[in-house]
């Protein structure tokens, strides 16, 4: 909202604060559009008030969200480059190239040489993908003694009537897009390099058909996730074409995930995506109607509305656990934009919490809870006291004040992890699952229609859940798709094909 000259405050100090706040807001918006979003901080001079960050030291003092286990490093040193040192993996097949000397005769006496040993070296080799045509031949047999004795084996099931792709090729196309983020137009270019023209529209039709076959398995995946006592949830945009308009319509891809590995719980890791045209609280209620337990989320209003409605209706209980990383990120932004020593102090306090989390990761839920009560709870009390002190001393319109207001407004949910060792300190588990979606979306740009969005959700859910289970996504999908299409696995046996139950009996061990 713009202010007229006569509406501006007369106090010079207040005007200066407004200018600094506006400059910080502009810098923040520019960084959202053009800048990196890493949360690695540099040491900042507490006396610095300028937005010029060019003189910052390079010693990190806070962490980002990119640790594989969701933990943070309070101090990050220079890491050596990762290299393959030693022997190549034993599970890779070997082939031998034997190089004999030009002559096996002794150079001194011309006598025959005998083998006394060998020198072996290994080098990694690759055999590029080979396209081939699978010919299915069904001989017909007839009886010479009668006219009605013709016999022929029935035609095998095909994953698509009239299609010219095998289940293996269809699996390759799907995995290339959703696991390795190769858009269909690039895959079409790769196939052209092999000498065959495949339109990307054809590839898309094959992917849609794969999703059709896998839909019952996807439904079981979502049912499993929602049956757990703790679920992480998040959402991200997924543009789709909107005929008649000059721009795409912004739809949503919701994610729900489970992962008990931080406390060695029984549930296998899994993630399910749901395509929707809405981001409303009603949509959240529709998706989570059957869920009751702990829902770990960011501060999005729809989740708070959902929990409030559940509380009023006395229906299945829902407890919200909020993400401490989201609260911390707001203070990190303030430090980066204004160099605020107060914000840096808050980040440093939060770093203590994450250091404790790093140390207790992998312990039992009981041990985690005890450690949190003993060590983390005092830190969180210290944090709240400091936030309340700062709240009374700074401009209510400043970026720091807004970060403090957000944190205090979500305080109960941010402390949920203290009383339950099975609750995580943040929702980074589900946020990491969004990185794969973001890469696929960046390369593919949009989905063509609602069916395309639903196909995206089905395939991304199963492929990423397979990766979370440590499987080779292609080996899993090719085998599962063939079993479903051929009918060797019935509808009542689909549970055995979920990634954590799958046995690679026919295709070798999973990666």
From Swiss-Prot:
Keywords for the protein's UniProt record, in alphabetical order: Plasmid
Annotated region (Disordered), positions in chain: 59-79
SUPFAM superfamilies the record matches: P-loop containing nucleoside triphosphate hydrolases
Pfam families, per the entry: DDE_Tnp_IS66, DDE_Tnp_IS66_C, LZ_Tnp_IS66, zf-IS66
Cystine connections: none
Sequence similarity: Belongs to the transposase 25 family.
Protein's UniProt name: Uncharacterized protein y4jD
Organism: Sinorhizobium fredii (strain NBRC 101917 / NGR234)
């Amino acid at each position: 909202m713009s202010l007229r000259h006569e509406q501006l405050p007369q106090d010079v100090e207040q005007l200066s604060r407004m200018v600094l706040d506006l400059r910080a807001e502009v810098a923040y918006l520019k960084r959202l559009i053009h800048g990196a979003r890493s949360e690695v901080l540099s040491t900042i001079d507490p006396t610095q008030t300028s937005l010029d960050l060019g003189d910052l030291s390079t010693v990190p003092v806070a962490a980002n969200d990119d640790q594989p286990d969701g933990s943070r490093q309070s101090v990050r040193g220079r890491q050596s480059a990762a290299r393959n040192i030693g022997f190549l993996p034993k599970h890779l097949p070997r082939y031998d190239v034997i190089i004999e000397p030009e002559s096996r005769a002794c150079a001194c006496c011309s006598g025959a040489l005998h083998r006394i040993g060998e020198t072996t070296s290994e080098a990694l080799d690759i055999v590029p993908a080979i396209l081939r045509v699978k010919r299915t031949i069904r001989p017909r047999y007839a009886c010479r003694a009668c006219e009605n004795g013709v016999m022929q084996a029935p035609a095998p099931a095909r994953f698509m009537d009239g299609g010219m792709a095998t289940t293996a090729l269809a699996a390759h196309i799907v995995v290339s897009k959703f696991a390795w983020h190769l858009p269909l137009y690039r895959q079409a270019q790769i196939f052209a390099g092999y000498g065959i023209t495949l339109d990307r529209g054809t590839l898309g039709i094959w992917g849609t058909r794969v999703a059709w076959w896998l839909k019952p398995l996807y439904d079981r995946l979502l049912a499993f996730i929602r049956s757990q006592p703790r679920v992480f949830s998040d959402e991200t945009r997924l543009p789709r074409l909107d005929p008649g308009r000059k721009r795409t319509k912004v739809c949503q891809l919701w994610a729900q995930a489970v992962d008990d590995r931080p406390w060695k719980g029984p549930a296998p890791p899994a993630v399910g995506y749901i395509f929707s045209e809405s981001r409303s609280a009603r949509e959240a209620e529709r998706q989570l109607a059957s869920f009751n337990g702990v829902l770990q989320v960011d501060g999005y209003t729809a989740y708070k509305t959902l929990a409030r409605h559940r509380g009023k209706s006395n229906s299945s209980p829902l407890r919200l656990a909020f993400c401490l990383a989201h609260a911390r990120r707001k203070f990190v932004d303030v430090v980066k934009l204004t160099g605020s020593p107060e914000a840096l102090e808050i980040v440093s306090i939060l770093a203590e919490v994450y250091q404790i989390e790093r140390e207790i990761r992998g312990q039992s839920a009981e041990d985690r809870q005890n450690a949190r009560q003993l060590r983390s709870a005092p830190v969180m009390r210290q944090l709240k006291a400091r936030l309340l002190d700062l709240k009374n001393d700074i401009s209510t319109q400043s970026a720091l004040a807004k970060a403090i207001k957000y944190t205090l407004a979500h305080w109960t949910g941010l402390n949920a992890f203290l009383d339950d060792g099975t609750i995580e300190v943040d929702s980074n588990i589900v946020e990491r699952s969004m990185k794969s979606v973001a890469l696929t979306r960046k390369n593919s740009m949009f989905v063509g229609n609602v069916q395309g969005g639903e196909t995206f959700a089905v395939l991304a859910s199963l492929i990423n859940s397979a990766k979370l289970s440590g499987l080779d996504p292609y080996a899993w999908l090719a085998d599962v798709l063939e079993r479903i299409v051929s009918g060797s696995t019935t509808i009542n046996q689909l549970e055995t094909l979920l990634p954590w139950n799958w046995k690679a009996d026919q295709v070798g061990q999973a990666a």
